[in-house]
Design a protein with these regions (language model features):
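Charge-biased, low-complexity intrinsically disordered regions
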Residues: 1-234
Length: 234
């Protein structure tokens, strides 16, 4: 199984890097209070820091708005995952749901480092994974929905041989490959725009691997994809 990025992604969106964690032998079945505690603390911290702040004034959020516009998705209608997460934290009316340890962990990291982070269950992936542009034929059921939908031509998607894994880059993941309690082998991606400092990106990768190995008893391999490395084995 391979994960490849269409070269046009790097041509159209300069400064993009995709951090990849390949996770093996994970135990995602038990409640991990340490991860929940990290998530709740970060939610409170972000609420305090972002109250009264226009999210569009944050360079890392503004960058994703421009990326969405560039591939034809209005960011007023379709928010990047990091903007949606920060918006929820700033609102603070209720905590993020306790889904499972790995999802809780990447939500914590996403809030802390202000980068979109997501994961897919590799046992549910069909064929190879590609980050590229939709040809308008990819289908699937998005998380939180029970209706099949078709991608729009030209939108940036993660996809496999069966359909989309995530629409509009990081806007909405597919239900088919979601992380659940039974997941043992997964791919996590951390998406860096040029506005995010390199050391912040590296710290996010290192902390992600450390927490996964410590609390989920997993083995992690870290790779970074960029114009010099556009395909990796999973």
């Amino acid at each position: 199984m391979k994960f490849s990025i269409d070269p046009q992604i790097f041509e159209m969106f300069s400064g993009i890097s995709i951090g990849v964690l390949i996770i093996n032998d994970m135990i995602n079945t038990r409640n991990v209070e340490e991860i929940i505690s990290l998530l709740r603390h970060e939610e409170r911290k972000q609420k305090e820091a972002l109250t009264g702040i226009e999210l569009g004034s944050l360079p890392e959020v503004s960058a994703w708005r421009e990326i969405y516009r560039a591939f034809g998705s209005n960011p007023k209608d379709f928010r990047s995952s990091i903007e949606s997460l920060l918006r929820r934290a700033r609102g603070g009316s209720k905590p993020l749901p306790d889904i499972n340890p790995l999802v809780n962990l990447y939500n914590y990291l996403s809030l802390k480092y202000h980068m979109p982070i997501g994961a897919e269950d590799l046992a549910k992936v069909s064929g190879n994974i590609i980050l590229g542009f939709s040809d308008g034929s990819e289908e699937g059921v998005a998380l939180g929905s029970d209706e099949e939908e078709t991608c729009v031509f030209g939108e940036v998607i993660y996809k496999d041989d069966e359909g989309f894994l995530c629409r509009r880059w990081n806007w909405r993941e597919a239900d088919r490959t979601k992380i659940d309690a039974a997941t043992q082998r997964a791919i996590m991606v951390i998406e860096k725009v040029k506005e995010v400092p390199e050391d912040t990106f590296q710290h996010a990768l290192t902390e992600a691997a450390s927490l996964i190995e410590q609390h989920l008893n997993a083995r992690c391999a870290i790779m970074v994809m960029n114009p010099q490395r556009m395909s990796i084995d999973l």
